[in-house]
Amino acid sequence: MIRKTIILLLFIIVSITWGTTFIAIRIASDTIPPLCITGMRFLLASFFLIFLCFYTKTPLLFPSNKKIFQLIICIFYFSLPFLLILYGGRYVNSTIASVIFAIMPIIVLFLSFIFFNKKLYFFQFIGLVLAIIFLSIILFKEIELGDEKTIKGVIALLLAMTSHAIIYLYSKEKYSNISILTFNALPSLLSGLFFLVISNILEHPKFDNFSNISILATFYLSYFSGVFGILSYFYLQKKVSAFQASTIFFIFPIINLMLEEFVWGNSIGIDQLQLIVFLMSSILITIFPFDLKNFMRFIKNFKK
């Protein structure tokens, strides 16, 4: 009973933190420049992660023969993707942005099939194709309503999501023995310093202009959405199957959609909503480990 309660709480926490991330970014960016937000977010999170490393006696550095991958994580999992997210988020609706990141499980599945020869079931392939089709239609409609900057924003978000997926997959396959604290602590610190230096050069942030609500949103992004959300998700992955953990990607865009309408009164058209539902259903089909042969065998045995 206690185990089920913990799993349910973890599921709720991760769904809420991920579903509110783009909303919190928008609130924080009301008075804080975007590069500065990201720098503060990573830097604040890194302090707590480094403290946890010392408290739990977890190494900050990767093993000597794997240190280069720690730098790769810093660049391609933190700095570059979040730079692209900042750019894309300026020109793409937050609901559409969350939908783009919702397809990450199927991108990971597809890349696993391509690079690591992981088995891809027939229905997973069908779900993958359908998800790509529905996402393409959704993005085409979003671009149709926008302009050239919207196209660039969509491309930036797709590149950010793909970069995340590649590093996540590679680290899972090759570096699964690395602690999640080690994985995040120093890359967060270095990325935070990088963004703050760039922000100071390009944005010239003035602390006096920061509103209390924007500062609170930044702390929320750092600790609740960042540290707490990430640690909860990785802990959840150890408690449940990959399929059960991946259903969060099905839930958090819906939370974002509801909050977008509740906070700002922004709603999407019924056609676009239907497409999102179809896309989410396709994702569910793709991440569900359904084997047609086993299913047919079950039907035959059932008839007997």
UniProtKB/Swiss-Prot annotation:
Keywords, sorted A to Z: Cell membrane, Membrane, Repeat, Transmembrane, Transmembrane helix, Transport
Annotated InterPro entries: AA-Vitamin_Transporters, EamA_dom
Regions crossing the membrane: 5-25, 42-62, 68-88, 96-116, 120-140, 150-170, 178-198, 215-235, 245-265, 268-288
Pfam family, one: EamA
Gene Ontology CC annotations of this record: plasma membrane
Superkingdom, taxonomy of origin: Bacteria
Presence of keyword Transmembrane: yes
Topological category with respect to the lipid bilayer: Multi-pass membrane protein
Residue ranges occupied by any EamA domain in the UniProt entry: 16-140, 162-288
Places the protein is found: Cell membrane
UniProt-listed PANTHER family: INNER MEMBRANE TRANSPORTER (PTHR32322), PROTEIN PAGO (PTHR32322:SF14)
Family per similarity comment: Belongs to the EamA transporter family.
Protein's UniProt name: Uncharacterized transporter in trpA 3'region
Native source species: Buchnera aphidicola subsp. Schlechtendalia chinensis
